[in-house]
């Protein structure tokens, strides 16, 4: 499972909120485009 898949899974299942997903971009786990794909909002 890639980091993108992990973050998406955690967010989709309510384990992570948007702040945690945003921090994943800061830590280079996912890109800003992937953030937008996961959450549906602009980074």
Where is each model-derived feature located?
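Viral virion structural and adsorption modules
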Residues: 1-43
């Amino acid at each position: 499972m890639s980091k993108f898949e992990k973050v998406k899974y955690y967010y989709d299942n309510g384990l992570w909120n948007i702040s945690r997903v945003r921090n994943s971009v800061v830590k280079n786990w996912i890109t800003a485009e992937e953030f937008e794909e996961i959450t549906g909002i602009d980074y």
